[in-house]
From Swiss-Prot:
PANTHER family: 60 KDA HEAT SHOCK PROTEIN, MITOCHONDRIAL. PROSITE patterns: CHAPERONINS_CPN60 (PS00296). It is found in: Cytoplasm. Forms a cylinder of 14 subunits composed of two heptameric rings stacked back-to-back. Interacts with the co-chaperonin GroES. One of its GO terms (biological process) is response to heat. One of its GO terms (cellular component) is GroEL-GroES complex. It catalyses: ATP + H2O + a folded polypeptide = ADP + phosphate + an unfolded polypeptide. CDD domains: GroEL. It comes from Chloroflexus aurantiacus (strain ATCC 29366 / DSM 635 / J-10-fl). This is Chaperonin GroEL 2. NCBIfam families: GroEL, PRK00013.1, PRK12849.1, PRK12850.1, PRK12851.1.
């Protein structure tokens, strides 16, 4: 296919046009006094959003050369969202500021490769300074403040603080669309997996359509149980112990084995419940091992030379309660050894750090949460569908920001952490003039998020930046900054205006990375448009038959 090419200043001008177009749409959403953006959908109601990455993902320009600039800048927002889950607008604002200042230097004759080298050196120093500023997240109030700032909603902040209190910092929180007009949350006590009872005959509470066992024995196996001879020894052992409650977790239970369990349940001889094992393949084996450790049992598997008929009471797990409906089973307060459970959690956390797959990481985090007994569901409601989707996006941002804050700590918000990092550039050693120029570009760009926050609040950005510096000198306190909601200069940490260090760091790293790519681009290549076909009527065949 034929290609179109443009070079040098013409290429950089096209990139700049695309970058400025995207940034203009995204940066209007920055801060608590930023505006919303409405996104048209081909079907359904339009989406109204305050989320920078949602706006960025929607933008495609007709001009293919300018669109390359859009796609490059979009990477700063998307990558920041992937790593930290928030801070996408900050990344876009920083990247645009670095690119615009850098392009002026390139147009004046500066070497782009040396500029990039200076940006990379400065970036390393700035990231180190941001990490130095970070304070470990300790109190419930700090968690609430992080969530409130990210969602720009005090109710969301309070709810997330409450949920994190109850499920712990290793817990899993999922966000769903609710059916009411307000926020709701559910806490799942114990380990839940998405397999329900095999037969409705196991139900003990017909009003709730649930099967409930108190202090049951738990048989865990990865094989299919069809023959009664496989189950008979363990059934006799359970009954001889004086207990009647038994949970069977297996690949499947059918045939005479299922019939025997159901008949004994109906006669009242045995209060049994059979459920299928969760997951598939290797993940199933791992999850069965999790259940065994949680309940103090053993997985009966032919892979380790154990047959089902050889199982004894010592191989069975125990729990305070088991509850199952047609879709889910919950094991509450397993009797497993606490040290073994903690060792398993530590092992899973190690796997989380080493895995490169986002899907595997998510599944591992779920397993950690289930072992530590913390899973919560937040249901987001609103009067209309667009409002509900917009609020759900903000709740997800707040959740990601809270997790990031737990991970790497917190820094002063309102763009002040970046402002406070600027002196770190004074200690960077440079070899070439362009490297020194790049450090000056960063000095100017790091002020831009604060300028934009002030601009969105209707203030003069440059005046606010200068006033913040004066207030910091006056109070000898680097935590002073501008509260855009009240229009006053306050100690941001005391006022609860804080950002996760991971979010600020990721935004800066990705902005510098994208800016370096743009500044060192000398040629653009895109597909040439195909010539339009003429709308003539095709000739008719001869009627000679």
């Amino acid at each position: 296919m034929a290609k179109q090419l443009i070079f040098d200043q013409q290429a950089r001008t096209a990139l700049k046009h695309g970058i400025d177009t995207l940034a203009l749409a995204v940066k209007t959403t920055l801060g608590p006094r930023g505006r919303n953006v409405a996104l048209d959908k081909k079907w359904g109601a339009p989406t109204v959003t305050h989320d920078g990455v949602s706006v960025a993902k929607e933008i495609e320009l007709k001009d293919p050369f300018a669109n390359l600039g859009v796609q490059l800048l979009k990477q700063a927002a998307v990558k920041t969202n992937d790593v930290a889950g928030d801070g996408t607008t900050t990344a876009t604002v920083l990247a645009q500021a670095i690119i615009n200042e850098g392009l002026k230097l390139v147009a004046a004759g500066a070497n782009p490769m040396l500029l990039k080298r200076g940006l990379d050196k400065g970036g390393q120093a700035l990231v180190a300074r941001i990490k130095e500023q970070a304070i470990t997240l300790k109190t419930r109030d700090e968690i609430r403040n992080v969530a409130t700032i990210s969602a720009q909603d005090a109710e969301v902040g309070e709810l997330l603080a409450t949920v994190m209190d109850k499920i712990g910092r290793d817990g899993v929180v999922t966000v769903e669309e609710g059916k009411s007009t307000h926020l709701e949350h559910e806490l799942v006590e114990g380990m839940q997996f998405d397999r329900g009872y095999i037969s409705p005959y196991f139900i003990t509470d017909s009003a709730r359509m649930e099967a409930v066992l108190d202090e049951p024995y738990i048989l865990i196996t990865d094989k299919k149980i069809s023959a009664i001879k496989d189950l008979l020894p363990i059934l006799e052992a359970v009954l001889s112990s004086g207990k009647k409650d038994l949970l069977v977790i297996a690949e499947d239970v059918d045939g005479e084995a299922l019939a025997t369990l159901v008949v004994n349940k109906l006669r009242g001889t045995l209060n049994a419940l059979a459920v299928k094992a969760p997951g598939f393949g290797d993940r199933r084996k791992a999850m069965l091992q999790d259940i065994a450790i949680l309940t103090g049992g053993t997985v009966i598997s032919e892979e380790i030379g154990r047959k089902l008929e050889s199982a004894t009471l010592q191989d069975l797990g125990r729990a305070r309660r088991v509850k199952a409906d047609k879709d889910n089973t919950v094991i509450v307060e397993g009797h497993g050894d606490k040290q073994a459970i903690q060792a398993r959690i530590a092992q899973l956390k190690q796997q989380i750090e080493t895995t490169t797959s986002d899907y595997d990481r998510e599944k591992l985090q779920e397993r950690v949460a289930k072992l530590s007994g913390g899973v919560a569901v937040i249901k987001v409601g609103a009067p209309t569908e667009p409002a509900m989707k917009e609020r759900k996006a903000r709740v997800e941002d707040a959740l990601n920001a809270t997790r990031a804050a737990v991970e790497e700590g917190i820094v002063p918000g309102g763009g002040v952490a970046l402002l406070n990092a600027i002196p770190a550039l004074d200690n960077v050693t440079t070899q070439f003039e362009e490297e020194r120029m790049a450090l000056n570009v960063l000095r100017r760009a790091l002020e831009e998020p604060l300028r934009q926050l002030a601009t969105n609040a209707g203030e003069d950005g440059s005046v606010v930046v200068e006033n913040v510096r004066n207030e910091q000198r006056k109070h000898n306190n680097n935590h002073y900054g501008y509260d855009v909601m009240t229009g006053t200069y306050v100690d941001l940490m005391q006022a609860g205006i804080i950002d996760p260090a991971k979010v600020v760091r990721s935004a800066l790293e990705n902005a510098i990375s994208v800016a370096g790519m743009v500044l060192t681009t000398e040629a653009l290549i895109v597909d040439a448009p195909e010539p339009k076909k003429k709308n003539g009527t095709p000739p008719m065949p001869d009627d000679d038959f």
